[in-house]
Amino acid sequence: MSDNTKIGFIGFGNMAQAIADGLLSKNAAAAENIFACAANWEKLCRNTKKRGIIPCRDAAETAVNSDIVILAVKPYMMADVTSTVKSILKDKIVISVAAGYPFEKFEEILLPGTHHISTIPNTPVSIGEGIFICENRHSLSDSELALVENIF
């Protein structure tokens, strides 16, 4: 991964925080290259400040500033959250950590040609010891998939 690859989290709950902690602990990303947004601004600011991560006011700000966008919201929120940023996501690597939201559903809610993969991580990723189960079906290029595998 490039030292300046920027990673954004849309949703910054427990799993997103665990992933961010793992990225930071493995030096896979610098804190100033990680962006996050969440529904509760005050809680987001507390959680990003202690990590040195940049808080964003909304999904659009997060997506615009990121090369890789991690969708870390509940499955029932996914269509609403992505509806406002799908044109921005088209030029990004999109990773979902929402269990039960498969490739086919993303094909319905994202613009055609958006590069995305669905994963299921576990919380030991916070110390760089967890696993990411990746759905076999995805729309990443070989180099994008290699980048995702390298990061996680």
Region roles according to the model:
Residues 1-57, 64:
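NAD(P)+-binding Rossmann beta1-loop-alpha1 motif at the extreme N-terminus of oxidoreductases
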Residues 7-9, 69, 95, 148:
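Hydrophobic packing within well-folded, soluble alpha/beta domains
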Residues 12, 16, 44, 66, ...:
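A general structural signal for well-ordered alpha-helical segments in protein cores
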Residues 23-24, 49-52, 83-87, 108-113, ...:
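Short, glycine/charged-enriched secondary-structure capping and boundary segments
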Residues 35, 56, 95, 117-119:
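Hydrophobic/aromatic beta-strand patches that form the interior of the parallel beta-sheet core
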Residues 54-110:
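Rossmann-fold NAD(P) dinucleotide-binding segment
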Residues 105-115, 131-152:
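Internal alpha-helical scaffold of NAD(P)-dependent oxidoreductase catalytic cores
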